[in-house]
């Protein structure tokens, strides 16, 4: 994409989309970038060489059927949705010739957190759909943005299962925790809380408009984890006076939290491109 006559189209200029645009400008200062927000015509994509769908999952699912009529046959289409199976399945039903499902593991709380280095050193998951040329182009693109491409070979199921555990369960747990705390303490008493509550409920500030589509499209993996967590909490509630049970929970959590640390290496079932 070094040719200054080439265009990048970003559909959905939120935190991720805006950061992609900023990172692309950092890499290719003279690149033409067009951003398309909700309600604007997709025809604005024009002759874009790369089209990035950076909208929420449910919006991406609505956009995909409309793309073939407005994009060049040679255009590479990449999405950034937090779940992959539903999106990849929907893309396969269209006439999009070069599509790669993707998911950058980077973010923030709002568009105010957008920055050019958001993806530097971060994993960017890409799903291999037996299109080696498109996958290679996508990997080069995300590398140019500073990210490390990590390839899933199974069509998105393993990605969605992993995200249910490390992203989607923490989100819904944080939201539910904040709601329960507010009911139990009373809204007028929340200002007495210390940093512990703020730290453990940071994700509770996330908008439902983004997460509805994520949770709905990954229900098969998220629901069992929620039930497992509920069962674990229920069992612990009956053993709060048992020091051995409490120690077991805290010890496992301490070890796991230490392992989380600053590690950014992909899991063993992933393969770097």
Give the ranges of each region predicted by the language model:
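Interdomain hinge/lid region at the active-site interface
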Residues: 188-257
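Rossmann-like NAD(P)(H) cofactor-binding subdomain of soluble oxidoreductases
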Residues: 63-113
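Phosphate-coordination loops involved in phosphoryl transfer and adenosine-cofactor binding
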Residues: 4-7, 74, 121
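NAD(P)+-binding Rossmann beta1-loop-alpha1 motif at the extreme N-terminus of oxidoreductases
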Residues: 1-46, 50
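Rossmann-fold dinucleotide-binding core
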Residues: 91-152, 160-163
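Anionic-ligand binding region
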Residues: 135-201
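Rossmann-like NAD(P)-binding element
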Residues: 43-72, 76
